[in-house]
Amino acid sequence: MNPLIQSLTEGQLRTDIPSFRPGDTVRVHAKVVEGNRERIQIFEGVVIARKGAGISENYTVRKISNGIGVERIFPIHTPRVEKIEVVRYGKVRRAKLYYLRALQGKAARIKEIRR
């Protein structure tokens, strides 16, 4: 990478990000702007993918809401996310868990790692 670009992006990287992987259940506290108000919305689900590197890295979180699958993609280093909590650690053997989209109920469960 160009040293100039690298030096500019190093100052924007966040250091308060916990380590999490696909298969982990996370609780993302995202800032939502509605008109002139700003509030925190919690989105809890399973991380199904992590993509990119450096400042452009992002992750996809999937949850089931009222029987409908909802996925949101968050950049890791965005100021719009106040904090990320890891609720549980999952044991999976894939880096991308897109196959969970086709599974329902107990088949979509992920084995938990005790830490």
Curated annotation (Swiss-Prot):
- In Gene Ontology terms, what is one molecular function of this protein? structural constituent of ribosome
GO annotations of cellular component type: cytosolic large ribosomal subunit
Entry-linked Pfam families:
Ribosomal_L19
Q: Which SUPFAM superfamilies match?
A: Translation proteins SH3-like domain
Stored InterPro entries: Ribosomal_bL19, Ribosomal_bL19_CS, Ribosomal_bL19_sf, Translation_prot_SH3-like_sf
What span is annotated as the signal peptide, if there is one? none
BP term (GO), one:
translation
* Family per record: Belongs to the bacterial ribosomal protein bL19 family.
Q: Give the function comment from the record.
A: This protein is located at the 30S-50S ribosomal subunit interface and may play a role in the structure and function of the aminoacyl-tRNA binding site.
| Matching NCBIfam families | rplS_bact (TIGR01024)
The entry's protein name is Large ribosomal subunit protein bL19
Q: Which organism is it from?
A: Streptococcus pneumoniae serotype 2 (strain D39 / NCTC 7466)
Instruction: Name the gene that codes for it.
Output: rplS
